Amino acid sequence: MAIHADTHDDLRLFQTGEHACGYWSDRRARDLVLDPHDPRLGAIYPQALAWGFRRSGDLVYRPHCERCRACVPVRIAVDAFHPDRSQRRCLTRNQDLVVRVVAAERTDEQLALYRQYLKYRHPGGGMDEHGATEFDQFLIGGWSHGRFLEIREPAIAHLPGRLLAVAVTDVTEHALSAIYTFYAPEAAARSLGTFAILQQIQWAQRERRAHVYLGYWIEGHAKMNYKRRFSALEAYDGRHWCDLPAHPSGT
C-alpha cells in the first residue's frame, strides 16, 4: 500500500493509499496514521484520542478520506451520563452476570469466544479465520494500555462461570477507549454490546476518568445507530468536541 509522509510539529503522520471502505461497499477510504515506529507512541496516544484518532493493534489512525467525512469521533462525558429506559432494562436484565477487569493477556477461553463471534458476525470474510496471532496483533498490540473487561455467567461451585463477552478497553489517565467487544452469539438477546459500554462507563466513573471513547459514529449506518442512544455524547469536528444529543430512535 502506498504511503505518503507528512509532519505535525515533530510528530510524523502518514497518509495511506486508498483502500476499500469498511463501512460502505461503494466507497473508498484512506487514513492518517501516527508513525508506528515512534518510540513515544504510547505516551502520545492519550492526546491522539482527543484528536479523534483510534487504535487498532499497534496502529493509531484516523479516517482521512478524500470525498467523505462520514466517520465522526464520539465519546461519552461520563459524569453527565444518565441511562435511558432501554439501558436501565439492559442493566436489570444482566444483573446476574459477573463483571471483572483483567490484564490484556489472551487465554484459550477468550480466543475460542473470539473465533466463535467472528464466525457468527463475519462469515466468509477472512476475519473468521483469525487465530492467536491475529488476536494478539488486532486487540493487544505491543505497547497499548489495554485491559479486558470480562462478562461471565455466575460462578458454580467456586468455579468461574461461562465467559459470555470480552470488551477490549484501553486505559489512559483521563479516559477509557472501547476498542472491540465480542460475545457469545447465543447470548445476543442480552444486548451484551450495550451492557459492556454501560460497564465501561461505570468503570470510568469509579476511577474518576472523564470520558469513554466509542470510536466513530456514522449517520445513517445501521451498525452505528446504537451509539446515539447514549446521553452526554460528544462529537469531534476536527477542532473541538461538541455535544451530540442522544437519539432515542437509535438501536
Swiss-Prot record:
Pfam families from the UniProt entry: ATE_C (PF04377), ATE_N (PF04376)
EC number, UniProt record: 2.3.2.29
SUPFAM superfamilies, A to Z: Acyl-CoA N-acyltransferases (Nat)
Keywords recorded for this protein, A-Z: Acyltransferase, Cytoplasm, Transferase
One term under GO cellular component: cytoplasm
Cystine connections: none
Subcellular localization: Cytoplasm
Keyword Transcription regulation: no
GO BP terms in the entry: ubiquitin-dependent protein catabolic process via the N-end rule pathway
InterPro entries (UniProt xref): Acyl_CoA_acyltransferase, Asp_Glu_LeuTrfase, N-end_Aminoacyl_Trfase, N-end_Aminoacyl_Trfase_C, N-end_Aminoacyl_Trfase_N
The family this protein is said to belong to: Belongs to the R-transferase family. Bpt subfamily.
Name of the molecule in the record: Aspartate/glutamate leucyltransferase
Source organism (scientific name): Xanthomonas oryzae pv. oryzae (strain KACC10331 / KXO85)
